[in-house]
Each structure stands twice: as structure tokens, then as C-alpha cells.
């Protein structure tokens, strides 16, 4: 597989929120981008149109928790770009707040499949392609975890927190597996960020309610997380692997 002319990145779950913000940052850096979405095609297509004035971009619908759809997604990337050099594992869900005693197996399995299996599958397919590239080509993966991996989110989202704890472990283990090939693997742990995900958890204004707990006294913005992701992807972080960066305002 020949090396892409420019850094080429897949950002899963990038129709809105942190994923969309990351796409915008990387587009301004002239990276080639694959926008991925599961169901909100209008947001993803609008973003694709916006970024197409800056760089080469494709938009692919796929549920990255389903292996067959992941394979099809990467096949489209191969066709459009000849492969990829970078991956942002961003896709994930949050379900309505409840204590563990009220959770059933269906909910827990959905959470783990969407938030964990998806990252394993995409990391596997990305690594296959990265390993075919010359070691002179910079290659990196950034997994999106959460500050919940540290706090546990008791009485709200212990299943979500557990899924993100798994991502921290994946990041560490995979970074060691891929280090001999020069492929870097890191993660970011966003804290309370102003995105739509809180509404899906049943509390649209959760960031405002909890902002006084944050040492910086405010919630974060998606582009603040995006810039951290972009740095970890870039050659400025060429000696950084196996690291998990908290983007939490000090929480």
C-alpha cells in the first residue's frame, strides 16, 4: 500500500460534537478526512460540505459496533484514499441516568458493544493498514475515553464509566503492541464538555449544574478537546505513546 500524500484520518462518530470539532481542526491542517456517522446523516453531510472547501473529505455511514460495517467502512477509505495514517476512535453513546440496581443486561451489553467493541474493531483495521506503510510515515491512533473512567459516575452511568475504563486499558496495551512498528496510541479523557451527549443521558444542562466542581470554573468546549486530539495525532507528539491526557479543567 502506498503512503497517502497527506495525513489521512478516520474519525468515527464525527457528525457532531467532539468528532466534528476534531475534523474541523484537522481540515485546517490539510489532512484528508473520513467523516463517519451512524444515523444523523444531515449533520455529517453538512460538515462534509463545509470541510470540502478546505481538504479532501468523504462521508461514510457505518455502525462501527458491527464488524461487517467496519470492514465496509475501511474498504471505502481504501478506495478513496489508498489507506489511512491516523485514527480517532470517537464513536460512543450515553444512556439515561440510573443506578446499577436498575440496569439490565440489554443496556449494559449495548453500552459495551457501542463504546468498546467499536474501538477494538476500528483499531484493528487501522493497524492492519498502518503496518503496511513505511516506518518513515507518521501513524497514530487516539482513543476518546472519558473522565468518567476515573470517577466511576456512581448513580448515573457506571456502565458508561466502565466502558471508558476499558478504553484506557486498550490504549495502554495496544500502545505496547504497536510501538515496535513506530505506531503511537494515546487517549484523551474529556471531562464536562458542552455537547449533546448530556441530553441523551437525560440532563441537558448537566455541565452547568456541575461546573462549580471544576477548578477552572466552567465546562469545556468541543474544540478544546479537538486541539488535544490533534496534538496527539501530530508529529509534535512523536515521543508520546501509551499516554492518557485529561482534558477536564482540572477535575
Predicted regions and their residues:
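Conserved glycine-rich cofactor-binding loop
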Residues: 15-17
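Catalytic Tyr-X3-Lys loop
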Residues: 101-121, 142, 167, 216
